[in-house]
């Protein structure tokens, strides 16, 4: 962080866009078509969009070196430009104009990258085609000058001088935590990220993420703000807390969009944006709308109508998703590349159905009603008691919501310790969303059984959403101790401290014999949950896990 003097926060609006709520502004700025075109200043190609935006791209490495909107420079901080990853090396950079479109093409090894401008628009359309792992390409970052969009949101650490974890989690003087990781949002939740002063808005409108990884519920950094400047990100393949292998091919367009203070036009949003004007530009890997297919389902039965359902399509080459209609489960997933896909139906974030579907370009594949078997939803099993809800998330557990935008040490968090009594009415709210080996392992759950219940063996289930350092639950019931379960496959990076519970949902089952229960029905049985692992360090970086639900089956 810079050593610049602290100053009062100027009023700026924090904007992370939802397709469901964003009000669109005009797609194009005030056109001055006569000025649309480009020049060569020797080091850069200089593009005037014919509206209020002029941008420059380096002829040497394809960096975006300037973004001037209404006469103000927005690009760059700390001597750095906007680019793929931390910048490409010496590249082949060319420019062409075709009518009302200018295309800049960048080739660096096997990676191809593109910037496009349209006459009269204050937008830069961007594509990135990563062919293999020879070029690291986890993100595109738009770097923004310091002081233009000052704010004190969870992903802004301008006013958080104390480093508390790694080099990317910070604390303010009051203890509140800040980090670039604290976006609060899943991919499915947002269409754009950015800031506005009220008179100028700068955003990155995300692509459809067909070549990204992690699915609709993936969480990652989306932007940051520090004393040095700010950054807006399009995630290409971010390895932090990642559950899938990297996909290759063309991702985009994602759009760098300027407005007069409002939110970006919904015409730029993923699923809405049309780019027929790019069909003949020769972009490597580009597949026009006519070469794509659609998957539609007439309905989904067996749903719990208290939850939202999402239908995902995925293979090694691409990923897509769409929301199921609340009334009948109808869904439509358009713009799909041809191929065979695994189709997954999610209740919340919990997979409750999988199938397969083949997509052909230019056609719609219509599926008959999908029936979710009752046994696929763990919530349908009869239980003596249950804590949490089987939806694939820690929603409702203590501190669950806060942990998507704060560190566990944040003073706003309730105590991570404390035991739970079944029948108290506050079981879920009292149960911590996360348990770490070095913080609150050994949590106790008290419950009574009837004589008939105590006379039989029962299955205890613990559902988790991710784990850090192979943390997994070992249970003790009164004097009976379970075996240590094998760790399921989970991301190897930080998760619980960087705003994400999203890993691989897994259910541990424990067969508790009848001999484990107390025979005196007036006494409480005691369930102890310990996190075990041979990995991790201390405190919040000790081995840990995040909970979905736990129950004792009848």
Go through each PLM region and give its residues:
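Short, surface-exposed beta-strand/beta-hairpin micro-motifs centered on an aromatic residue
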Residues: 321-322, 326-335
């Amino acid at each position: 962080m810079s050593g610049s003097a602290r100053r009062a926060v100027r009023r700026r609006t924090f904007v992370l866009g939802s397709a469901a709520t964003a009000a669109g502004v005009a797609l194009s700025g005030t056109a001055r078509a006569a000025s649309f075109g480009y020049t060569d200043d020797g080091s850069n190609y200089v593009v005037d969009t014919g509206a209020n935006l002029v941008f420059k791209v380096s002829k040497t490495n394809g960096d975006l070196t300037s973004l001037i909107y209404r006469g103000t420079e927005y690009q760059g901080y700390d001597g750095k430009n906007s680019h793929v990853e931390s910048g490409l090396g010496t590249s082949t950079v060319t420019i062409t104009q075709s009518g009302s479109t200018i295309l800049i093409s960048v080739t660096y090894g096997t990676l191809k990258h593109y910037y496009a401008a349209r006459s009269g628009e204050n937008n830069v359309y961007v594509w990135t085609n990563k062919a293999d792992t020879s070029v690291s390409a986890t993100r595109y970052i738009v770097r923004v000058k310091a002081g233009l969009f000052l704010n004190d949101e969870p992903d802004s650490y301008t006013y958080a001088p104390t480093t508390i974890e790694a080099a990317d989690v910070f604390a303010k003087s009051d203890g509140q935590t800040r980090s670039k990781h604290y976006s609060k949002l899943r991919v499915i939740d947002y269409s754009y990220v950015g800031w506005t002063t009220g008179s100028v808005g700068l955003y990155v409108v995300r692509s459809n993420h067909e070549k990204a990884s992690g699915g609709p519920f993936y969480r990652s950094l989306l932007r940051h703000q520090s004393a040095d400047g700010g950054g807006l990100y399009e995630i290409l393949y971010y390895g932090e807390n990642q559950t899938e292998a990297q996909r290759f091919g063309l991702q985009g367009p994602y759009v760098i969009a300027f407005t007069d203070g409002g939110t970006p036009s919904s015409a730029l949003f993923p699923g809405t944006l049309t780019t027929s004007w790019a069909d003949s530009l020769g972009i490597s890997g580009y597949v026009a709308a006519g070469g794509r297919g659609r998957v539609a389902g007439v309905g989904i039965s067996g749903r719990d109508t208290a939850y939202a359902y999402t239908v995902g399509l995925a293979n090694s080459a691409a990923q897509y998703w769409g929301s199921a209609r609340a009334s009948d489960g109808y869904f439509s997933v358009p713009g799909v590349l041809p191929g065979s896909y695994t189709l997954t139906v999610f209740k919340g974030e919990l997979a409750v159905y999988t199938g397969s579907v083949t997509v052909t370009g230019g056609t719609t594949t219509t599926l008959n009603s999908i029936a979710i078997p009752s046994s696929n939803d763990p919530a349908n099993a009869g239980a003596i008691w249950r804590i949490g809800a089987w939806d694939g998330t820690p929603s409702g557990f203590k501190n669950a919501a806060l942990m998507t935008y704060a560190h566990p040490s944040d003073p706003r968090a309730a105590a991570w310790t404390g035991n739970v009594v079944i029948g108290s009415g506050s079981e879920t709210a009292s149960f911590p969303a996360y348990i770490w080996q070095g913080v609150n392992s050994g949590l106790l759950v008290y419950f009574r059984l009837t004589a008939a219940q105590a006379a039989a063996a029962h299955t205890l289930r613990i559902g988790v959403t991710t784990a850090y350092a192979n943390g997994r639950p070992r249970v003790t019931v009164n004097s009976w101790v379970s075996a240590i379960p094998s760790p399921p496959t989970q991301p190897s990076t930080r998760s619980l401290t960087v705003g994400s519970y999203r890993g691989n949902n897994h259910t541990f089952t424990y067969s508790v014999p009848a001999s484990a229960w107390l025979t005196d029905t007036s006494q409480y049985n005691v369930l102890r949950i310990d996190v075990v692992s041979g990995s991790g360090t201390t405190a919040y970086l000790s081995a840990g896990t995040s909970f979905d639900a736990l129950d004792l089956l009848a």
